[in-house]
A protein has these predicted regions:
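Binuclear metal-ion centers of metallo-dependent hydrolases, dominated by the metallo-beta-lactamase
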Residues: 136-151, 249, 254-308
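Pre-active-site segment of Zn-dependent metallo-hydrolases
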Residues: 28-36, 58-102, 107, 115-116, ...
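Beta-strand-turn-beta hairpins that frame and shape the catalytic cleft
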Residues: 36-41, 54-60, 151-160, 203-209
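Active-site HxH/HxHxD metal-binding segment of metal-dependent hydrolases
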Residues: 71-72, 89-152, 157-174
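Sec-dependent signal peptide recognition
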Residues: 1-9
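Active-site-proximal loop/helix segments of hydrolase catalytic cores
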Residues: 182-250
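Active-site environment of divalent metal-dependent phosphoester hydrolases
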Residues: 49, 69, 106-111, 132-135, ...
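Active-site neighborhood of phospho(di)ester-bond hydrolases with catalytic His/Asp-centered motifs
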Residues: 62-63, 97-107, 126-128, 210-215, ...
């Protein structure tokens, strides 16, 4: 029954809408080939909910996932392996050394590639206990367990961990559960348990960035969190879209970047395509009506953008 439910859900996502063509006015990027200006923060979208942030010669990654396993492998619980060719392609757009990888929760589309990326970039993992135990199960122990309220300075970055939640899919919470100790490296999608969802406030060079993969809870954020320069907010499912306006009102961002809305079964080389369960016209509507005054933007794969 669970497998059937997974298949029905992922089949519905696999059907896709158009790409960015009709929204080209919202797509922002630095001029091609331009170098980052010292003292700025640059953002590169890596696909799904993956991002690279750069400041003062340092890099930070959030939820990097390049393998983009196929629909049938997920739905029928086949063995998942990181695709080293696709990881190599993705890492061509990432600095060779990374200070840390932050993970918002432990599902495969956020964590599967992290062991290989940690090995190649010498990064450490900052994540919840389940994610760290899964990484230790795969032979990686360069990790730091965090929970909401945690703060840490790493290089130019100041990182604050905030509470979050995961969207429900037709009332169902996918692959729920935690992992309290290391064991066997996960083999299939359902082995990558949800764990402890979290959001991050990242500060560097005078800029403040809020990152969540979706499901931002309706809680009052600490006063020192807002306002932010950029809010990256997952909008893959109706749950998070229903809360989007309230989240924006709490965060008071200059820029809003909707995230986790691409077809993550399709390789990035094929270009950005919206997943079928997304509703970008609905996301865009209150901005068009000037009901939300923040600037709505989109980022395309691997095209860096410097936060003004």
């Amino acid at each position: 029954m669970v497998t059937l439910r997974i298949f029905v859900f992922f089949f519905s996502v696999h059907g896709a809408l158009a790409g960015f063509d009709q929204y080209s006015a919202l797509v922002t990027a630095d001029p091609p080939g331009s170098q980052q200006v010292p003292g700025t923060v640059r953002v590169t979208y890596l696909g799904v909910n993956g991002y690279q942030f750069e400041a003062n010669g340092h890099a930070l990654l959030v939820d990097p996932y390049f393998t983009r396993a196929g629909l049938t492998a997920i739905a029928f619980q086949r063995r998942l392996e990181p695709n080293e060719t696709r990881i190599s392609f993705g890492l061509r757009h990432v600095r060779p050394r990374v200070d840390a990888v932050l993970v918002t929760h432990s599902h495969f589309d956020h964590l599967l590639d992290v062991p290989e990326i940690m090995k190649r970039t010498n990064a450490r993992l900052i994540a919840g206990a389940t994610a760290v135990n899964l990484m230790m199960s795969c032979g990686l122990d360069r990790s730091l367990v965090v929970e909401p309220g945690f703060t840490r300075a790493i290089g130019p970055w100041r990182i604050r961990v905030l509470p979050s939640a995961h969207d429900r899919i037709f009332g169902w919470l996918p692959f729920r559960g935690t992992k309290t100790h290391p064991g066997t490296c996960p083999a299939k999608a359902s082995d990558w348990r949800l764990g402890e969802p979290m959001a991050f406030l990242i500060e560097a060079s005078g800029k403040r960035i809020y990152v969540d993969s979706g499901g931002t809870p309706e809680v009052q954020l600490p006063p020192q969190v807002t306002p932010v320069d950029l809010a990256i907010l997952g909008v893959a499912l109706p749950d998070s879209r229903r809360r989007l306006r309230a989240t924006i009102e709490r965060l008071r961002p200059k820029y809003v970047l909707p995230s986790h809305q691409d077809d993550f079964f399709s390789p990035v080389e094929r270009g950005f395509v919206f997943g079928k369960l997304t509703d970008f016209p609905g996301v865009m509507r209150p901005f068009q009506r000037h009901e939300i005054t923040s600037h709505l933007i989109l980022l395309d794969y691997f095209r860096p953008w410097t936060i003004p």
